[in-house]
């Protein structure tokens, strides 16, 4: 039985117990939410060293880090270091999006490197193999090659796979009729639309969705239903193509649940601040409360080099409104492949957004951390502040580099004129 099937039969599995303990939630409550589809336990039966990850309603907002090679940078060592840095920085999951070099070897090395939840987009490799190994165009892929690629990733232990099943001929027609500035910016979505247009055929992952469900079920992996029509700029947000795809994903969610397979839904993208909450409400309604996994959202299009900040702003609003899983964006977004420092900075920025949202959600223990930090600050207790900081190493480093005079105990911003010290001096001396 799958985790969903066990949950529906009232069985609390070992994976549920482990994931619940890691999340700080009662295992029976987690089971109930898995049964209703509002939470998942993400773990492939083939991922021997992986820890099950609980995502969804009433759980900590999760953070994913995307890594992976490109044709221009195929170093396995670089990607393994990014994986290590992402986990050390607090990422809950890692997606390998490699499109260059020995892709199988890279994915297997990343899976072996960490216990973190691992995701991938099998279509990327299917497309790359078609071009590099077979000398054909992406549009010449066969449906069997797409499904064979999915099976290979599942065999390797990938815990969740992004599949662009909601990219359909009817959605393409709506996009073309309404018009967009940036058309399709999802890489997997663009591959699929190009294939459909060239072959004048429906998306195999939609047309043969039952085949996909049968393939995934023995692994008990999670389907991450990709948003091929996510907006790539603010002006394209919340248009007909995006929402039509979301309606389809809601239908596919129910079909997956009927087959005993866990699902989460992927979301935008680039979205103006005043539209983010509405996007979350639409997803939760149309997709029946399934966990929502959003990329950002980025709240402006003009900040290349700072898109980890635009992502964190949107991510905090989205998660505060009910999004469950935030995919980070790094400072290199829209510019180049991220380096190791970019990965660290992206994870930290998105963790800040996730924590801010957990306070809004009333997650047990979230606000308590901030209260403890406030008390340590008032008492000029620097060691406790370092321990409570989201990035202890950076906090210690910046203070240490400042040349602070430890005799007054404050920092170089105020020194002896520190407000805490001034207020402390007005207290009666014992």
UniProtKB/Swiss-Prot annotation:
Enzyme class label:
lyase
Residues binding [4Fe-4S] cluster are 411, 414, 418
Q: Which family does it belong to?
A: Belongs to the ThiC family.
Asked whether the UniProt record includes Oxidoreductase among its keywords, one would answer no
Q: What keyword terms does UniProt attach to this protein? A: 4Fe-4S, Iron, Iron-sulfur, Lyase, Metal-binding, S-adenosyl-L-methionine, Thiamine biosynthesis, Zinc
Could you tell me what this protein is called? Phosphomethylpyrimidine synthase 2
GO terms for biological process, alphabetical: thiamine biosynthetic process; thiamine diphosphate biosynthetic process
Q: Which Pfam families match?
A: ThiC_Rad_SAM (PF01964)
User: What InterPro entries does the record tag this protein with?
Assistant: ThiC (IPR037509), ThiC/Bza_core_dom (IPR038521), ThiC/BzaA/B (IPR002817)
């Amino acid at each position: 039985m799958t985790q969903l099937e066990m949950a529906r039969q009232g069985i609390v599995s070992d994976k549920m117990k482990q994931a619940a303990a890691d999340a700080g939630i009662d295992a029976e409550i987690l089971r109930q939410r898995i049964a209703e589809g509002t939470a998942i336990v993400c773990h492939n039966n083939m991922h021997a060293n992986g820890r099950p990850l609980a995502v969804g309603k009433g759980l900590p907002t999760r953070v994913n880090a995307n890594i992976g090679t490109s044709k221009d940078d195929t170093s396995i060592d670089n990607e393994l270091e990014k994986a290590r840095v992402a986990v050390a920085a607090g990422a809950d999951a890692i997606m390998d999006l490699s499109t260059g070099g020995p892709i199988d070897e890279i994915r297997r090395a990343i899976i072996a490197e960490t216990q973190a939840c691992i995701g991938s987009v099998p279509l990327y490799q299917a497309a790359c193999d078609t071009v590099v190994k077979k000398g054909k165009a992406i549009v010449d892929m066969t449906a069997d090659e797409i499904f064979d690629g999915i099976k290979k990733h599942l065999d390797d232990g990938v815990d969740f796979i992004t599949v662009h099943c909601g990219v359909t001929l009817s959605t393409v027609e709506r996009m073309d009729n309404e018009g967009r500035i940036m058309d399709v910016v999802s890489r997997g979505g663009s591959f699929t639309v190009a294939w459909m247009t060239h072959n004048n055929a429906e998306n195999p992952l939609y047309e043969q969705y039952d085949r996909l469900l049968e393939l995934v079920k023995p692994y008990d992996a999670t389907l991450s239903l990709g948003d091929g029509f996510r907006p790539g700029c603010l002006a394209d947000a919340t248009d007909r193509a995006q929402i039509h795809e979301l309606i389809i994903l809601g239908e596919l969610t129910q079909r997956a649940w009927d087959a005993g397979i866990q699902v989460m839904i992927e979301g935008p993208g680039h979205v103006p601040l005043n539209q983010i909450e509405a996007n979350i409400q639409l997803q939760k309604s149309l997709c029946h409360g399934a966990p929502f996994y959003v990329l950002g959202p980025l709240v402006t299009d003009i900040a290349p080099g700072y898109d980890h900040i635009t992502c964190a702003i949107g991510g905090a609003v989205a998660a505060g409104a009910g999004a469950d899983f935030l995919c980070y964006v790094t400072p290199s977004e829209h510019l180049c492949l991220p380096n190791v420092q970019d990965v660290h900075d992206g994870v930290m920025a998105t963790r800040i957004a996730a924590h801010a949202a957990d306070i809004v959600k009333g997650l047990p223990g979230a606000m308590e951390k901030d209260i403890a930090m406030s008390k340590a600050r008032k008492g000029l207790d620097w060691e406790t502040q370092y321990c409570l900081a989201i990035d202890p190493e950076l906090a210690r480093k910046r203070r240490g580099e400042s040349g602070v005079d430890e005799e007054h105990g404050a920092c170089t911003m105020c020194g002896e004129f520190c407000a805490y010290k001034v207020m402390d001096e007005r207290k009666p001396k014992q």
